[in-house]
Each structure stands twice: as structure tokens, then as C-alpha cells.
A protein has these predicted regions:
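A short, internal acetyl-CoA/4′-phosphopantetheine-binding micro-motif in the GNAT/acyltransferase core
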Residues: 10-17, 174-181, 210
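A conserved beta-turn-beta hairpin within the catalytic core of GNAT-like acetyltransferases
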Residues: 2-8, 61, 164-171, 181
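Conserved active-site alpha-helix within GNAT-family acetyltransferase domains
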Residues: 46-60, 187, 211-229
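Conserved GNAT acetyl-CoA-binding A-motif
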Residues: 33-42, 197-208
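Acyl-donor-binding surface of acyltransferase catalytic domains
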Residues: 17-113
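A conserved beta-strand-loop-helix scaffold within acyl/acetyltransferase catalytic domains
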Residues: 129-177
Length: 229
């Protein structure tokens, strides 16, 4: 979520700066926005960093698991039909993909203010600071995106976001309204994003899921995802 995965400090490589200096800098940035300092710990980094943070009073607040898939192993959810606008519009994406039981996934090639506002309502984001910061985070994504939604009577009841980068697609913002669970909405959203990414030459997919979310993990495994760590 925005407080943890999306809004965390992630180590991406070695640095010549002293680790204490980097921690202090990150803490100052978070303090400026009146939000808690969040550091992401993964098996890919030096375990001593985890120990260093623990020594400073940091605690584990949120645990996620990473899943990956080679799209050659993708088990797609068969669609019924797709509707395209004129050639070149929407970055070649269909405007609508129809699934059984009249489930219609809408696609856009960019993140709009309307989609973000609907996402906040869908995932229950009410914190004023997050509602102010998160839109700029979405708008700052420098990569190609596949933005998905399902609407009922003009109201978004399911969402998904695919971010394409160097042969990989990441699945983000997979949410379904509580009143619409068990209708294959999440399966339709994920399958649509993965299918369209594959058409664009993407060969691998990844996602993160909250530890203990057995229903989501079952869905992702049925699509072909496997645990990485």
C-alpha cells in the first residue's frame, strides 16, 4: 500500500556514502512530509542493514511476498471479445475487453485524475497527506502503463495497473470492491493487463502480495505466478 510498499526507501545498489548519512537523509525527507520513515528489507540486501535499523528502534510493520512469472507460462482467463478505437489511439490497447457474465474491463494507456480518485474510494485511502502525495507519485511513473478498471453504473468497482519496463510488467493496485468479490473481477483485470503486455513483447511479470492473503495468492498461482521470496 502507499504507506509501506509504494512509499518506502529501497536499496538499488552500492553507494560510497556512509550508511548513517543516507538513513539520516531519508528520515529528514519523510519528516518533511509528516509521514513515518519506511525502509524496505528484502533477501537481496545485506542482512546487517536490517540489524542496523532494528538497533535504531525500527520495527516490522508490513510483510509482503514477491511472485514472478515467465509469460510463456501465463494461464490466461479467456475473453469473449475486445473493442478497439481507431488505429493508434490508446497506444494500441483495446478500449474494452469483455469476459463471461458481461464482465467488461476498460483500458487506458495513462493514469488519469478520475482513476486515482476512484482508486482512493476503492481502497479506502482517506489520509489527507497520502491523497495529496500519491497522485504525484503516479504521475511521475516514467514508464509505459496499462490502466484497467471495471465499472458498474459509472462507479469503479475493480482496478489494476500494469507498469512495463525492460521486458517486465509489474502488477499494481489490484483492488475489488467488497460487494463485488468472487465474480472473477480481479482475474479479468490481471489477465487483461498481462495479455496486453505480452502483445507488446513483454516476457516476464512480477507482483507483490501481502503475506497471509491466501485468496490473492491462489488467484495469482492460477494465472501462473510462482513465489520468488
Amino acid at each position: 500500500n502507499y504507506t509501506h510498499r509504494t512509499n518506502s526507501v529501497t536499496q538499488v545498489g552500492a553507494s560510497l556514502l556512509p550508511i548513517e548519512e543516507k538513513i539520516h537523509y531519508c528520515e529528514a525527507v519523510y519528516a518533511n512530509y509528516h509521514t513515518p520513515s519506511i525502509f524496505k528489507i528484502s533477501p537481496l540486501i545485506d542482512p546487517s542493514f536490517d540489524e542496523l535499523l532494528a538497533g535504531k528502534g525500527y520495527e516490522i510493520q508490513h510483510v509482503t511476498e514477491t511472485m514472478t512469472m515467465e509469460l510463456s507460462q501465463f494461464q490466461r482467463y479467456p475473453s469473449v471479445s475486445a473493442e478497439y478505437e481507431y488505429y493508434g489511439r490508446n497506444s494500441g490497447l483495446p478500449s474494452f475487453v469483455v469476459y463471461p457474465d458481461d464482465v467488461i474491463v476498460q483500458l487506458q494507456d495513462r493514469i488519469t485524475d478520475e482513476w486515482i480518485t476512484s482508486l482512493f474510494r476503492l481502497n479506502g485511502t482517506t489520509n489527507p497527506t497520502l491523497r495529496r502525495i500519491v497522485p504525484s507519485m503516479f504521475k511521475a511513473i516514467p514508464k509505459e502503463t496499462i490502466v484497467a478498471s471495471i465499472e458498474i453504473d459509472g462507479r469503479m468497482v475493480a482496478s489494476g495497473l500494469g507498469i512495463l519496463d525492460r521486458g517486465h510488467v509489474g502488477l499494481y493496485a489490484i483492488y475489488v470492491d467488497a460487494s463485488c468479490r468472487h465474480k472473477h473481477y480481479a482475474r479479468a483485470i490481471c489477465s487483461t493487463i498481462l495479455s496486453e503486455a505480452q502483445k507488446k513483447g513483454i516476457t516476464h511479470a512480477y507482483l507483490q502480495v501481502v503475506q497471509g492473503n491466501a485468496y490473492a495468492k491462489s488467484l495469482y498461482r492460477s494465472l501462473g505466478f510462482e513465489d520468488l521470496y
